[in-house]
């Protein structure tokens, strides 16, 4: 698990780069290599398999979460889309993911508007981890958080990287976050 930092001014294309790598936006030229394979122009089936290995943590935890879904529903959604697990298995995995990112079990039926920014970002992190990815684009994951919460979330991300051997593309405009 390594981290590559992408630092630049607002509007310079950092987030666009992350989205192109994940195929959330189409590339216009060049190649994107993932695990030694060109994934620039893959069919839908291959793209679906890639998405399990490549995830994103968005900058704004509030706008990236569906306000009509509970915490457990948000975290469980990728598992439902993938299929192959019973509801009980998905629920168990969701509870484990909540524990992994430091979300109390009592929050499973809470909605995003009921939580602070740090907890919302932990939901986004748990959702990104649900399919056991190898690579995560971290698109300014702490820029919308209070400074005290930023350190907690960054420490969590470092711990997860070590435990799960994750590779991060860490996008930020703040050099102190990259140094952290």
Question: Which residue stretches match the model-derived regions?
Answer:
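Conserved ABC ATPase "signature" region
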Residues: 38, 88-106
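Conserved ABC transporter NBD signature motif
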Residues: 30-38
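Hydrophobic anchor residue at the start of the ABC signature
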Residues: 125, 153
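Conserved ABC ATPase signature
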Residues: 111-115, 119
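A short, proline-enriched helix->beta-strand linker immediately N-terminal to the Walker B motif
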Residues: 130-134
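ABC ATPase NBD coupling module
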Residues: 39-55, 81, 87
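Helix-to-loop junction immediately C-terminal to a conserved catalytic motif
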Residues: 22
């Amino acid at each position: 698990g390594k981290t590559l930092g992408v630092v630049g001014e607002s509007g310079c294309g950092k987030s666009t780069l992350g989205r192109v790598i994940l195929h959330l936006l189409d590339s216009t030229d060049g190649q994107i290599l993932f695990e030694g394979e060109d994934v620039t122009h893959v069919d839908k089936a291959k793209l679906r398999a890639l998405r399990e290995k490549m995830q994103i943590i968005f900058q704004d935890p509030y706008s990236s979460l569906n306000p009509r879904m509970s915490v457990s529903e948000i975290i469980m959604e990728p598992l439902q889309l993938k299929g192959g697990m019973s509801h009980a298995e998905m629920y168990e995995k969701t509870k484990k993911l909540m524990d992994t990112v430091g979300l109390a079990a009592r929050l499973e039926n809470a909605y995003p508007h009921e939580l602070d920014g740090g907890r919302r970002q932990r939901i986004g992190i748990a959702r990104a981890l649900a399919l056991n990815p190898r690579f995560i684009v971290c698109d300014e994951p702490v820029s919308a958080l209070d400074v005290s919460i930023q350190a907690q979330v960054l420490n969590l991300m470092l711990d997860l990287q070590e435990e799960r051997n994750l590779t991060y593309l860490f996008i930020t405009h703040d050099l102190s976050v990259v140094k952290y």
